[in-house]
């Protein structure tokens, strides 16, 4: 799910060259995601690729971390070169009408930092995707050997008690989860389609996306940046159990992936946090060290964003049948609640076993156990087969889905101690189980992005 590269210099000959790339999507129990997961994973290379000529010394990575202290904005820039060198890097940042420059000297090193201060930059905020620009030029032996140009955003994110703050102001998440999938494009969703999806999301009155359950293409996050949509990017630790917690190879794989996510996606202001896991067996004692290690990778390498854990405090019956995960001892809080910044509750009351009234009871119970951080409902929902309507509200009807979602949203909005929600999910997608004919139909629009009844009812609820 993340970008990768090969150095093919030794295979290139003078004249015309032909290259063939062989890939597979082999599933590995020690992988991330693990061997079993409930979404369709297409084979082949389904994201953009390019052939690139690089000099001996080039800009390997760069991250722009915006901060605000005492009313003053500044950026901390971190740059990594391909190897240690004696070079100079010129930096130019433009934000609104303001332009700042700096020069970084590499004296036999491959990493360097710089801080640039701004008086009144263009500030990125939810609903207002104001972006700034950074240009880097690497000069070695009086010659420009490499250049890089990117966009970033001035914004801050933090927590204050149970509140989530963006740019110092309280922000309530009203969102839905996505999967990286479209019936026409498969996993190769183009940027213009993502932009269309996000505009439809905003039309419904929603302001955030949980990009479940793996890193998406950069085109998706760039679209979120432009549209002012808040996003949580996610590490594919999906329903991990003691096997994964006890395997050093799994932890090494996941921590490496977390580091790559930061380096590849860290300049997107729409990403306000990293989700470290979904519905894993977090009550197992060995889970604490495993997920604390992942949390630490994110916080040590990116202190400007939050971490989220999406839990099943009371496991839905379907998960208990499929796999023994998150077996919650009565009255206990998941062990990840001790260190993550935001605690997520996944619960499908009204769909899998429990009555609809169970979700608000669960939220009140969780809030009594976790009092020092934001709590969000990270998943809730019901399936609806598009076009199925009935006054008797049977399962799989648009009417039942709409009634249940609106009821649960009202209960969430009544509770000031809940920092927001992510509906599961925005559009239907192909999956391997728990589905109608291989489709998870919990979307409030169908896979072709045609709205169901729930879309319009939620729109009316959130925009009275």
Roles of regions detected by a PLM:
Residues 2-6, 110-116:
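Short strand-edge motifs at loop-to-beta-strand transitions and within beta-strands
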């Amino acid at each position: 799910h993340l970008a990768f590269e090969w150095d093919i210099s030794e295979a290139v000959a003078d004249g015309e060259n032909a290259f063939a790339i062989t890939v597979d999507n082999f599933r590995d129990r020690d992988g991330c995601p693990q061997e079993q997961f409930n979404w369709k994973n297409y084979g082949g290379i389904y994201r953009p690729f390019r052939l690139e000529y690089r000099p001996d010394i080039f800009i390997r990575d760069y991250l722009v971390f915006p901060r605000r202290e005492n009313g003053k904005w500044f950026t901390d820039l971190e740059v990594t070169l391909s190897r240690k060198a004696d070079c100079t890097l010129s930096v130019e940042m433009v934000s609104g009408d303001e332009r700042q420059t700096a020069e970084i000297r590499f004296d036999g090193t491959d990493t360097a930092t710089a801080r640039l201060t701004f008086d009144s930059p263009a500030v990125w905020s939810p609903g207002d995707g104001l972006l700034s620009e950074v240009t880097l030029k690497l000069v070695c032996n009086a010659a420009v050997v490499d250049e890089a140009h990117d966009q970033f955003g001035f914004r801050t994110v933090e927590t204050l008690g149970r509140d989530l703050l963006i740019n110092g102001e309280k922000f309530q998440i009203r969102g839905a989860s996505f999967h990286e999938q479209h019936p026409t494009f498969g996993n190769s969703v183009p940027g213009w389609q993502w932009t269309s999806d996000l505009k439809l999301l905003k039309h419904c009155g929603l302001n955030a996306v949980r990009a479940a359950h793996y890193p998406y293409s950069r085109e998706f996050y760039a679209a979120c940046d432009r549209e002012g949509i808040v996003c949580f990017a996610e590490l594919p630790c999906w329903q991990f159990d003691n096997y994964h917690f006890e395997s050093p190879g799994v932890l090494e794989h996941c921590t490496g992936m977390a580091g790559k996510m930061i380096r590849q996606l860290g300049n997107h202001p729409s990403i306000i946090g990293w989700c470290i896991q979904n519905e894993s067996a977090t009550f197992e004692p060995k889970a604490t060290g495993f997920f604390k290690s992942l949390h630490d990778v994110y916080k040590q390498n990116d202190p400007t964003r939050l971490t989220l854990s999406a839990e099943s405090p009371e496991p839905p019956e379907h998960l208990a049948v499929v796999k023994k995960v998150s077996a919650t001892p009565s009255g206990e809080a998941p062990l990840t609640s001790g260190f993550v910044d935001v605690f997520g509750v996944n619960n499908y009351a009204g769909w899998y076993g429990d009555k609809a009234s169970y979700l608000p009871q669960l939220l009140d119970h969780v809030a009594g156990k976790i009092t020092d951080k934001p709590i969000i409902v990270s998943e809730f929902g019901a399936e609806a087969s598009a076009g199925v309507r009935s006054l008797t509200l049977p399962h799989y009807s648009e009417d039942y889905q709409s009634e249940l979602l609106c009821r649960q949203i009202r209960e969430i909005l009544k509770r000031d101690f809940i920092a927001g929600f992510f509906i599961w999910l925005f559009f239907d997608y192909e999956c391997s189980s728990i589905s109608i004919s291989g489709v998870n139909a919990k979307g409030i629009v169908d896979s072709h992005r045609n709205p169901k009844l729930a879309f319009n009812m939620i729109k009316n609820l959130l925009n009275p």
